[in-house]
C-alpha cells in the first residue's frame, strides 16, 4: 500500500515526496514510542547488515577517540557466538580499518543457546564492545538482557553494548 500511495522521495518537496515523508515520520514516531527512544534517536537502514555496520562503526570510532585521549579501553570485542554473521565481520573490518588493535572474542552459548554469563563475567572487564542478540532469529532463544546488563555493571565495564533487538521487537 505504501509504495502505491507514497512512492515519492521523502526528501523531495513535491506532493508525492511530502506524502512519503509524512508516512515515514509517522512510522518513525511509532517505532520510537515502541522502543522508548528519544526524539531523533531512531535511524532507518536498508536492513540488518547496514544497521550492524552503522552501530559497530559508531562504537569503534568512539573507542578510538577514547584511546587517543589516553583513556583506559578494554582490549576485547566480544560478540555472541550465535550472532548474525555481519557482526563479527563488521567488528573485524572496522577494527582493522580504524586501527583500534582489539581482539575479537566469541561469547559461547549454553545447550539452550543462552549466552554463557560465567564467561562474560570473566571477559567483561576487558571489553571495549559487547554485541548480543535480544532474541535469536533461528532458534527463538531469548537472551537474558537484564543479567547481561548486571554483569556489565558489576564489572564496571565501560564497554559499548550493541543489542540486535529486531526479533524481539513488540514481544
Task: List each language-model region with its residue ranges.
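Pyridoxal 5′-phosphate
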Residues: 1-171
Amino acid at each position: 500500500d505504501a509504495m502505491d500511495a507514497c512512492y515519492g522521495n521523502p526528501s523531495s518537496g513535491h506532493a508525492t515526496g511530502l506524502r512519503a515523508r509524512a508516512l515515514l515520520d509517522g512510522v518513525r514516531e511509532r517505532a520510537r514510542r515502541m522502543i522508548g527512544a528519544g526524539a531523533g534517536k531512531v535511524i532507518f537502514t536498508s536492513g540488518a547488515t547496514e544497521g550492524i555496520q552503522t552501530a559497530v562503526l559508531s562504537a569503534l570510532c568512539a573507542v578510538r577517540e577514547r584511546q587517543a585521549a589516553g583513556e583506559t579501553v578494554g582490549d576485547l570485542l566480544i560478540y555472541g557466538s550465535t550472532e548474525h554473521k555481519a557482526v563479527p565481520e563488521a567488528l573485524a573490518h572496522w577494527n582493522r580499518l580504524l586501527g583500534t588493535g582489539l581482539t575479537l572474542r566469541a561469547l559461547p552459548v549454553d545447550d539452550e543457546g543462552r549466552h554463557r554469563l560465567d564467561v562474560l563475567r570473566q571477559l567483561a572487564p576487558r571489553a571495549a564492545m559487547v554485541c548480543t542478540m535480544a532474541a535469536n532469529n533461528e532458534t527463538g532463544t531469548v537472551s537474558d538482557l537484564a543479567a547481561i546488563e548486571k554483569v556489565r555493571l558489576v564489572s564496571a565495564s565501560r564497554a559499548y553494548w550493541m543489542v540486535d533487538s529486531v526479533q524481539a521487537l513488540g514481544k
